[in-house]
A protein has these predicted regions:
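Hinge/lid segment of periplasmic solute-binding proteins
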Residues: 87-141, 199, 283, 348-351
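C-terminal lobe and pocket-closing loops
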Residues: 103, 269-279, 289-385, 413
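Extracytoplasmic "Venus flytrap"
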Residues: 27-43, 63, 140, 371-375
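Glycine-centered hinge/linker elements that transmit conformational signals in sensory
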Residues: 171-172, 213-244
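Short, well-ordered beta-strand elements
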Residues: 24-34, 55-60, 82, 133, ...
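Conserved C-terminal helix/tail region of periplasmic/extracytoplasmic solute-binding proteins
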Residues: 56, 152, 158, 233-239, ...
C-alpha cells in the first residue's frame, strides 16, 4: 500500500490498567449498523460496562448516513471516541495510531487474528513506516450461494471447490428458464466497485496500479474487459439476470423465490436465506480458467479518534471488543479470532468453512484500490458510472473502460 500520511505519535506514560478515574465517564461509540447487528453491539457495550463499573458506553447508530455524520463530527471537533472504520486513508489524519498500545503492557496479542485482516487497517507514513489505525471487529469474504432445490430439480450435482466459471456457466444454462423468469446466476446491476474487484483480481487484473498512481492498463486491461464481457454475455444469453435494476428485484428476493440458482455475495444474505427456509449450499468462488482465486474482504474495524479525551479508556473498549467473549457475541459475521471460529466449529461447518477458506485468497499484495490512493473515492465515482454504462449498453465495453480509465486518472490527481 502506498497511501502516505504523516505519523502521529502517542504520548508517553499511557495508563493501561483499570483506572479509578474512569468512574462516571461516558465513552462514545459510533457504528453504521442497525437492526440485529446494532443490538449485538449494544450487548457488547453493556458487557464492557459491567466489567468497568461507572463507565457508560453511548452507542451512536449513524446508519446509512454514517460517513457524512462521522466526517461532520470530526470537522466540528465533536467526533466519537471509538468508531467503526473502513476507509482508513480518508480518515487517517483524524485517527489515533494504535501501535504503541499494541506493543505496550496492556497490548493485544494479534497472533489469534485471522491472517490477512490487519493490512486493511494500516497506512504507510511519509517516512516509509506503517501505522495501525484499527483493530478488526468482523469480516466476510465472498463465496457462492447455490439453491439446492433448483439443482436437485435440474438433476445437477452441487458445485464443489476448485470449480471454474465454465462450470458455473454450464450449470447456470441448465438451471435457467428465461421465459419463466428463472435464472441460473445473478449479476449485480449496480455493484460496489470494492466488491467487484474480487473478479478482476481473480482474472489477473485490478482497478489501479500497485503504486496507486494510475488506472490505465488496469481498469481497462484486457483481463478487466474479459470479466465484464463474460457477465454481459451471461445476461444476453439468458444464463443470468441483472438483478437490482428495473423490475428484476434483489438477489435475495429472487433466491428466496426459487428464481435464482446461484449468486456470489458475503455473509450478509445468509440470515435471510435461513429465515426463508431455503435449502442452500455454500462453495468457494469459481476460477477463471484455473487462475488463482482471490476474494476481497468486507471488514469492519474499530478505531480511536486522535482527539479523544479518554484514549486509554477507548483502547480498553477496543481491546474488549476484540476479546473472545465479545467476538463470540458477533453472530452475524465471521469471527476475527481463529480460536472463536474453532470453538464454534465453523471451519468444519459446510456453510461457514468456505468463507474461512477464502481468506487466504485475500492476498495482502492485492490491497483494495482505496488503500492505494487517498483520492480513490473520486475515481470510484467514474468506475461506478462506467459499470452502469456497460450493463445498460451491453456493447462497446473496451471503449467504455478506456474512457473511464482516462477520467479516473484525472480524478486521482485532483
Amino acid at each position: 500500500m502506498t497511501t502516505v500520511f504523516k505519523p502521529m505519535l502517542l504520548a508517553t506514560g499511557l495508563a493501561f490498567a483499570a483506572n479509578a478515574g474512569w468512574a462516571d465517564q461516558t465513552l462514545r461509540f459510533a457504528t453504521w449498523d442497525s437492526n440485529e447487528s446494532l443490538e449485538i453491539q449494544k450487548a457488547i457495550a453493556a458487557a464492557f460496562e459491567k466489567a468497568h463499573p461507572g463507565v457508560t458506553v453511548q452507542v451512536e447508530a449513524y446508519g446509512d448516513g454514517y460517513d457524512t455524520k462521522l466526517a461532520a463530527g470530526f470537522g466540528a471537533g465533536d467526533a466519537p471516541d471509538v468508531m467503526y472504520m473502513w476507509n482508513f486513508p480518508a480518515y487517517a489524519p483524524s485517527l489515533l495510531p494504535l501501535d504503541a498500545y499494541l506493543a505496550g503492557e496492556n497490548g493485544l496479542d494479534m497472533a489469534d487474528f485471522a491472517a490477512g485482516l490487519l493490512p486493511y487497517a494500516r497506512v504507510t507514513n511519509e517516512d516509509g513506516s506503517s501505522s495501525t489505525l484499527g483493530i478488526p471487529a468482523g469480516y466476510t469474504t465472498f463465496v457462492t450461494y447455490y439453491n439446492k432445490d433448483m439443482f436437485d430439480k435440474a438433476g445437477l450435482p452441487y458445485p464443489t471447490e476448485g470449480w471454474t466459471w465454465d462450470d458455473l456457466r454450464a450449470d447456470a444454462a441448465k438451471l435457467a428458464k428465461p421465459d419463466e423468469r428463472v435464472y441460473g446466476y445473478g449479476v449485480d446491476g449496480n455493484p460496489d466497485p470494492y466488491d467487484f474487484e474480487t473478479f478482476l483480481w481473480s482474472n489477473g487484473s485490478s482497478w489501479i496500479s500497485p503504486d496507486g498512481k494510475t488506472t490505465t492498463g488496469y481498469l481497462n486491461a484486457p483481463a478487466s474487459t474479459e470479466v465484464f464481457q463474460q457477465f454481459v454475455d451471461m445476461v444476453k444469453g439468458g444464463e443470468a439476470v441483472l438483478f437490482g435494476v428495473g423490475d428484476n428485484g434483489s438477489y435475495r428476493e429472487l433466491f428466496n423465490a426459487d428464481k435464482l440458482g446461484m449468486v456470489i455475495s458475503g455473509i450478509w444474505p445468509m440470515p435471510d436465506f435461513e429465515a426463508a427456509g431455503k435449502n442452500f449450499g455454500v462453495v468457494g468462488l469459481p476460477s477463471f480458467g484455473g487462475k488463482p482465486v482471490h476474494s476481497n474482504v468486507g471488514i469492519s474495524s474499530l478505531s480511536i479518534a486522535k482527539d479523544s479525551k479518554e484514549p486509554d479508556l477507548a483502547w480498553e473498549f477496543v481491546k474488549f471488543y476484540a476479546s473472545p467473549e465479545a467476538v463470540a457475541m458477533r453472530t452475524n459475521d465471521i469471527p476475527v479470532l481463529n480460536s472463536v471460529a474453532k470453538s464454534k466449529g465453523m471451519a468444519d461447518d459446510p456453510k461457514f468453512a468456505p468463507f474461512i477458506a477464502m481468506l487466504p485468497a485475500a492476498d495482502a499484495n492485492l490491497s483494495p484500490a482505496f488503500l492505494r490512493n487517498a483520492n480513490w473515492g473520486r475515481a470510484q465515482d467514474v468506475v461506478t458510472e462506467a459499470i452502469q454504462r456497460i450493463y445498460i449498453e451491453q456493447d462497446g465495453i473496451q471503449a467504455i473502460l478506456n474512457d473511464a480509465a482516462a477520467r479516473a486518472d484525472k480524478a486521482l490527481t485532483k
